[in-house]
Amino acid sequence: MNLSKIHHIAIIVSDYEAAKDFYVNKLGFSVIRENYRPERKDWKLDLRVNEHTELEIFAEENPPKRVNRPEACGLRHLAFCVESVEQTVNELTEVGIECEPIRVDDYAGKKMTFFHDPDGLPLELHE
């Protein structure tokens, strides 16, 4: 078996426009395609994170609330590799995104921090 890389990650959001603004205008991901699917009454937005990875955003009518504990089963957080945590935190702060204090990962010895998307999904920056 050769699982060489992650192609995409899919998340369900409660507010399509807020999520689109956050991921496109604040984080800078580019839109690959955007579709409203009337048979499902939902939006599907495909975003390019980098040359290898995509993020799929689904917005359904009245989705169940996310369990907002990192220790709950399912996706714990989504981590992005950056060259400089400090620089990226400054850029996020400039567009109104609040980050936790920067700390060093006890095991990897790398700088890291967390922030959240509009639905509270934890997002990590990691050097």
Task: Report residues per predicted region.
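Short amphipathic alpha-helices within nucleic acid-binding modules
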Residues: 22, 86-91
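N-terminal beta-strand motif that seeds the catalytic metal site of vicinal oxygen chelate
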Residues: 1-18, 75-80
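Short, charged/polar, Gly/Pro-enriched secondary-structure boundary elements
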Residues: 52-55, 120-122
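Short, charged/polar surface micro-motifs in flexible loops or helix N-caps
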Residues: 50-54, 62-63, 85-86
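Vicinal oxygen chelate
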Residues: 2, 35, 46, 89-127
